[in-house]
Amino acid sequence: MGPERKLYLKLKKNTDRIKWTRLENISLLGTPDLLGNNDSGNFFTVELKVTKGKKVKFSPHQIAFHVEHPHNSHILIEALGPRSSKLIGWYLYRGSRIKELVTQGLRLEPDAWGSDPSSLMLVAWPLEPEA
């Protein structure tokens, strides 16, 4: 099982107020990994990333998706310690910030962060709708 699949399972297990649909799409490159639906009936997308350093890797298609769809899109990053699987933290960014995230990596201040999915839920789920 890949690291992003493990991240999805942790997120799904600990965010029971959100209905998740995993989007495994090979025909539309760049489509985010998850479609979420919260208690308020709002839909949003989430791109999942797992990294062991400050840099976060995105494909050109993923960047293009978030540039084209900046509202109600998010990027959730699980940061692990270098050369280990020890969790450092979870970082949540709005999709509209993808260009900054590409250049600055995890040095960019997140919109929300925590040490587990439930702490993120208290801080950020659901994020306030963007204007």
Predicted regions and their residues:
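Acidic-basic catalytic patches of nuclease active cores, encompassing PD-(D/E)XK
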Residues: 1-25, 39, 131
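Beta-rich catalytic cores
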Residues: 30
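Conserved catalytic cores of phosphodiester-cleaving nucleases, focusing on short active-site segments
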Residues: 34-36, 41-52
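Mg2+/Mn2+-dependent nuclease catalytic core
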Residues: 51-70
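Nucleic-acid nuclease catalytic cores
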Residues: 67-98
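Extended, alpha-helix-rich binding/interface surfaces that flank or overlap catalytic cores
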Residues: 88-90, 106, 110
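Acidic, Ser/Thr-rich peripheral helices and adjacent loops at domain boundaries
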Residues: 97-106
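Charged phosphate-binding loop/patch that engages nucleotide di/tri-phosphates or the phosphate backbone
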Residues: 108-131
